[in-house]
């Protein structure tokens, strides 16, 4: 069974660019670094060689991870989602009922969420608690810091990740 991964168009493009960079640049660079390190002789105590091999392993693992995620990606155009309810890709304006401050988040996948940039994962506690809510609904979220309460002020389309 393949679990689909919701991903924005921008997030999908970013992962494809990273995969391209890893396969066309970094993979080749690390192979050259291994060759150069081999020329220095004894591989048992060759720190350069071992560091390059370790880097190669990390690059190959990331390539496999990216191929897996891209293969399971369900690409969603955040500018085309419905704004009737909170769903993946929507931009949600919330009123924090404790502080009376407004916060704005875009719900994205775990691979592309960045709280500082205003995007949160649909799998995060607040992301899960917002799903399917409508404007005017109350959102109660249990976080490690305690229970937080918000009101959904506005739901709109956007792509500001």
Curated annotation (Swiss-Prot):
UniProt xrefs under Gene3D superfamilies: Transcription elongation factor, GreA/GreB, C-terminal domain (3.10.50.30), Transcription elongation factor, GreA/GreB, N-terminal domain (1.10.287.180)
InterPro entries: GreA/GreB_C_sf (IPR036953), TF_GreA/GreB_CS (IPR018151), Tscrpt_elong_fac_GreA (IPR006359), Tscrpt_elong_fac_GreA/B (IPR028624), Tscrpt_elong_fac_GreA/B_C (IPR001437), Tscrpt_elong_fac_GreA/B_fam (IPR023459), Tscrpt_elong_fac_GreA/B_N (IPR022691), Tscrpt_elong_fac_GreA/B_N_sf (IPR036805)
Domain of life, source organism: Bacteria
GO process annotations (BP): DNA-templated transcription elongation; regulation of DNA-templated transcription elongation
Key words of the record: DNA-binding, Transcription, Transcription regulation
GO molecular function terms attached to this record: DNA binding; RNA polymerase binding
Pfam families linked to this entry: GreA_GreB, GreA_GreB_N
Homology family: Belongs to the GreA/GreB family.
Known function: Necessary for efficient RNA polymerase transcription elongation past template-encoded arresting sites. The arresting sites in DNA have the property of trapping a certain fraction of elongating RNA polymerases that pass through, resulting in locked ternary complexes. Cleavage of the nascent transcript by cleavage factors such as GreA or GreB allows the resumption of elongation from the new 3'terminus. GreA releases sequences of 2 to 3 nucleotides.
HAMAP family in alphabetical order: GreA_GreB
Protein's UniProt name: Transcription elongation factor GreA
């Amino acid at each position: 069974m393949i679990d689909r991964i919701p991903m924005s168009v921008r997030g999908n493009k970013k992962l494809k660019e990273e995969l391209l960079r890893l396969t066309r640049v970094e993979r080749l660079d690390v192979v050259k670094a291994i060759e150069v390190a081999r020329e220095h002789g004894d591989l048992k105590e060759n720190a350069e060689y071992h560091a390059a091999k370790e880097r190669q392993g990390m690059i190959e693992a990331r390539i496999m991870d990216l191929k897996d995620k891209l293969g399971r990606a369900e690409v969603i155009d955040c500018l085309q989602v419905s704004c009737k309810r909170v769903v993946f890709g929507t931009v949600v304006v919330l009123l924090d009922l404790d502080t009376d401050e407004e916060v704005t988040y875009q719900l994205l996948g775990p691979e592309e969420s960045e709280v500082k940039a205003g995007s949160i994962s649909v799998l995060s506690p607040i992301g899960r608690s917002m799903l399917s809510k409508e404007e005017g609904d109350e959102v109660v979220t249990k976080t490690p810091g305690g229970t937080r309460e918000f009101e959904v002020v506005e739901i709109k389309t956007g792509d500001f990740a």
